[in-house]
Regions:
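Catalytic machinery of carbohydrate-active enzymes
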Residues: 1-386
């Protein structure tokens, strides 16, 4: 996905492949005592609900339709979201939420048992009646049980949601729809997902000052593939190809190219710029997430890899041309009818954490395919995905 589900990496843990096997076997055994008792019915008018998704940016944005659905269903309840520091800025302005609970390091790379116990205590202090768990990790799914939350609804991937009172099967569908399945599992009506992000007024004002440029305004995000506890360079399209498309936007469309990226992405942006004949507006490393959202909101198009910024563009109403490699856009693609995902993969690709450079198909996407998609989206003639 844009930012993949970061599985927990406990300090001193075993190798991923061996651990996955052991976790799968252990979860199937652990779920037996949880299935002895019939779970209580979900409350008709809950007073306090928690959504639990520590990481990462794309996943959190894909959960915003669920946030809106819960608020529509229960206008007067207290609705909180437990999230890590990496993704917290994407929820700070969400009008449907009453509060945010910090997850610390849990679910965002390596963490200790003391980190885990501290989060259990924070969740217990919230006195929640129900928790919606959007993470596939059994340790994350176990948190609301340990915190004494009676109703636990969430994703059950391979039996890993053994502690949930309402386990929801993980089917082959878009991640945003999968999250909404958790609401439907307890009888909540949902609408077609629409991602949401709300820049602050001062962030929009800064974007206005920065982008007094010629249209079309095309944002290019050439980096990505980096999250807490994970680095996947196989998700990056070559910088020289971004450079060719960027020059065509400037020369053929008389537009403006805006390079975007976070701290640490400067080298990738520099690799694009040094291969260009024209000068882009380089904002790499200069913007907060909120300011990035405000800039994307003013752009006519965002071209980039499978990243959190891709989902952020959709959340502010900007169409996307997204280039995919090892991840599957049918699950993690831009969820917007105006957007296009370019992908040469297949279902035979291995799971993300086992992808090797020779497995990825991102370089199979050509400059001409990307350029054609850019023109098609800008002229509003795109088709939904692929």
């Amino acid at each position: 996905m844009g930012d993949e589900d970061s599985r927990p990496l406990l300090e001193g843990g075993a190798e991923i492949s061996l651990r996955d096997v052991l976790v799968g076997l252990g979860c199937r055994l652990l779920r037996l005592p949880f299935r002895v008792r019939k779970p209580p019915p979900f409350p008709a008018s809950p007073r306090a609900i928690l959504i639990l998704k520590p990481c990462c940016v794309g996943d959190v944005l894909l959960s915003t339709p669920l946030v809106a659905a819960l608020r529509r269903a229960y206008p007067h309840l207290r609705l909180d979201y437990a999230v890590g520091p990496w993704s917290r800025p994407l929820l700070e302005t969400n009008p449907h939420l009453d509060g945010l609970v910090g997850c610390g390091r849990v679910g965002s790379g390596r963490y200790s048992w003391s980190d885990y116990r501290a989060l259990v205590q924070r969740l217990r202090a919230g006195n929640y009646e129900a928790c919606f768990v959007l993470d596939r990790s059994p340790l994350i799914s176990l948190l609301p049980y340990l915190a004494g939350i009676p109703h636990r609804v969430g994703l059950d991937s391979g039996g890993r949601g053994f502690s949930l009172t309402v386990p929801v099967p993980v089917n082959m569908k878009h991640e945003a729809e999968l999250y909404l399945d958790t609401a439907q599992a307890v009888g909540i009506e949902v609408e077609r997902p629409a991602l949401e992000f709300y820049p602050r007024p001062q962030q929009r004002e800064r974007a206005h000052l920065l982008l007094d440029k010629a249209h079309p305004l095309v944002a290019i995000h050439p980096a990505g593939g980096r999250n807490p506890g994970m680095y996947l360079p196989a998700k990056r399209w070559p910088p020289e190809r971004f450079a060719v498309v960027a020059d065509r936007v400037i020369e053929s469309l008389r537009g403006t190219v805006v390079l975007l990226g976070g701290p640490g992405d400067e080298a990738v942006a520099a690799a694009v710029k040094e291969r260009m004949r024209n000068e882009p507006l380089d904002l790499t490393g200069r913007l907060t997430w909120g300011e990035t959202g405000a800039v994307l909101e003013k752009c006519d198009l965002c071209l980039g890899n499978d990243t959190g910024a891709m989902h952020l563009a959709v959340a502010v109403g900007t169409p996307v041309v997204a280039i995919f490699g090892p991840s599957d856009p049918r699950i993690y693609g831009p969820y917007d009818d105006r957007s296009v995902a370019l992908w040469k993969g297949s279902e035979s690709l291995p799971p993300l954490r086992q992808v090797k450079p020779e497995d990825t198909s991102i370089e199979a996407v050509t400059v001409e395919e990307a350029w054609e998609a850019v023109q098609r989206v800008l002229t509003k003639q795109s088709n939904p995905l692929y």
